[in-house]
């Protein structure tokens, strides 16, 4: 495996050729500047001999059909392996769900991004590939963050693409973080990366980014980079700014960020999440409605169990509507403009 990676510099290809696991860990050096450690299929660490104090996790492919972030991360990995760029910050790349990537599907059995913070081991337990993999990914993040001294900045960008069109093509979800202000610097980094819209979540979740935020105090985000397309069919010119800013972050080049300015970004507050309680749950709007579509107060968003679910605020925007989820799961996130967010 080591020789195959050294020859091809294509970590994604190696991962997809061995989607369940590698035979064992291996490591090697790039020149006299970087140690590379491969911990498992889809798990590669770049450890600079001299680093600048940030610990960065870039994860992709938690959903197997969300291919643009996978191609973006593989491009960065290849540039690092080719020594076209040199890491100055510790960086962990995670290709989340290789089995689903090979299958060309969002999941194999279950939505992995609902299985973190230990949810993978709650009943029924480790009964499918997503649950097993989520537990392993948690362990790799823990190992990465906790094997160095405290006091370093921890960052985790969990990269996705959405199943539907969006009023805002690229947007990020800022996990719930009670007692901690939101980072204006991080929001402006995202804006410079082409991600000009941020949603502030209002409650704990079992997503990958919430896990890193809550457990390790990381500046963590779920980042949606556009729409789902098959592997190789993404217009990667739409990710030039994202690639550039991630490259600057990893190589410790100046980020040249603007000071936080709420007028330069779109900020939303999650006002509620609507879960499914009955099999007859249905939305009243078209199935192909775009993310961030706004509806006025009193509008009937959905019906289930003989009851209507109406817009409660003057206007509410919807993201990720999906009526076909299992009972108990989220059908949609409702948003209002964020006017008093604690951003510093």
Swiss-Prot record:
Family stated for the protein in its record: Belongs to the AspA/AstE family. Succinylglutamate desuccinylase subfamily.
Cofactor detail note: Binds 1 zinc ion per subunit.
Catalytic activity: N-succinyl-L-glutamate + H2O = L-glutamate + succinate
NCBIfam families referenced in this protein's UniProt entry, alphabetically: arg_catab_astE (TIGR03242), PRK05324.1 (NF003706)
Protein name: Succinylglutamate desuccinylase
Residues binding Zn(2+), per UniProt: 63, 66, 160
Cofactor dependence: Zn(2+)
Lineage of producing organism: Bacteria, Pseudomonadati, Pseudomonadota, Gammaproteobacteria, Alteromonadales
């Amino acid at each position: 495996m080591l020789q195959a990676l050294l020859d091809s510099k294509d970590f994604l290809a190696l991962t997809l050729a061995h989607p369940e696991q590698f035979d064992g860990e291996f490591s090697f050096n790039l020149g006299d500047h970087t140690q590379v450690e491969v911990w498992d299929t889809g798990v590669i660490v770049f450890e600079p001999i001299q680093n600048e104090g940030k610990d960065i996790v870039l994860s992709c492919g938690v959903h197997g059909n969300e291919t643009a972030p996978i191609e973006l991360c593989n491009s960065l990995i290849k540039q690092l392996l080719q020594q076209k760029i040199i890491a100055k910050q510790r960086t962990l790349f995670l290709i989340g769900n290789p089995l689903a990537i090979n299958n060309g599907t969002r999941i194999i059995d279950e939505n992995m991004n609902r299985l973190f913070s230990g949810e993978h081991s709650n009943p029924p337990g480790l009964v499918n590939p997503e649950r097993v993999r989520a537990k392993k990914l948690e362990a790799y993040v823990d190992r990465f963050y906790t094997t160095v001294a405290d006091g370093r900045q921890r960052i985790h960008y969990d990269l996705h693409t959405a199943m539907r069109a969006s009023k805002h093509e690229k947007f990020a979800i800022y996990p719930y973080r009670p007692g901690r202000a939101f980072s204006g610097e991080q929001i402006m980094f995202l804006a410079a990366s082409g991600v000009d819209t941020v949603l502030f979540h209002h409650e704990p979740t079992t997503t990958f980014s919430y896990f890193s935020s809550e457990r390790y105090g990381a500046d963590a985000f779920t980042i949606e980079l556009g729409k789902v397309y098959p592997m190789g069919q993404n217009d990667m010119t739409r990710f030039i700014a994202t690639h550039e800013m991630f490259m600057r972050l990893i190589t410790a080049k100046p980020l040249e960020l603007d000071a936080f300015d709420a007028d330069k970004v779109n900020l939303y507050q999650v006002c509620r999440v609507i879960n499914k309680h009955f099999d007859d749950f249905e939305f009243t709007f078209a199935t192909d409605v775009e993310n961030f579509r706004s509806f006025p107060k009193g509008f009937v968003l959905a019906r289930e169990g003989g009851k209507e679910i109406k817009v409660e605020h003057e206007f509410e925007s919807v993201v990720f509507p999906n009526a076909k989820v299992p009972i108990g799961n989220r059908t949609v996130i409702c948003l209002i403009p964020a006017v008093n967010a604690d951003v510093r």
